[in-house]
Design a protein with these regions (language model features):
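Active-site helix/loop of acyl-thioester processing domains in fatty-acid/polyketide metabolism
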Residues: 22, 53-76
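Catalytic strand-loop segment that frames the active site of acyl-thioester-processing enzymes
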Residues: 14-53
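Short Pro/Gly-enriched beta-strand edge/turn motifs at strand-loop
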Residues: 1-6, 97-101
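Terminal leader/tail segments of proteins
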Residues: 13, 21-23, 35-37, 84, ...
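An N-terminal domain-start capping segment
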Residues: 7-14
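Conserved small/polar residues in nucleotide/adenosyl-binding loops
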Residues: 107-109
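Hydrophobic beta-strand-centered segment that forms part of the acyl-chain substrate-binding groove
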Residues: 65-105
Length: 109
């Protein structure tokens, strides 16, 4: 799904809509993608001369992608992401990188 279709699922807009495209892999797995352009608000000051996407923004990107997964399971309501376990950041995400979030529903909704 493209960003216009994602807007029908997520309430986020403008600079806080952090999923550019999403796709269902199967009934329990979805992928979301966002390419870091370099002009995003969260890179201003983090860090001058060496921009790195803050971990909290990476978590938000993953959360939004996971809400796209739930869209087909929960109709007529706004999905809210409430929990993450064992999050580890292995490499810095920088301008030009594309973050792909693979989300799996391990609990039945």
């Amino acid at each position: 799904m493209n960003q216009e279709e994602i807007k029908k699922i997520l309430p986020h807009r403008d600079n806080m809509l952090l999923v550019e495209e999403a796709e269902s892999v199967d009934e329990n797995t979805a992928k979301g993608r966002y390419t870091i352009k370099g002009d995003e608000f969260f890179l201003q000051g983090h860090f001058p001369g060496n921009p790195v996407v803050p971990g909290v923004i990476l978590c938000e990107m993953m959360g939004q992608a996971s809400c796209c997964l739930l869209a087909d399971k929960v109709k007529n309501c706004t999905p809210y992401f409430t929990k993450m376990n064992n999050v580890k950041f292995r490499n810095p995400v920088k301008p030009g990188d594309t973050l792909e979030s693979v989300c799996t529903d391990r609990k039945s909704v």
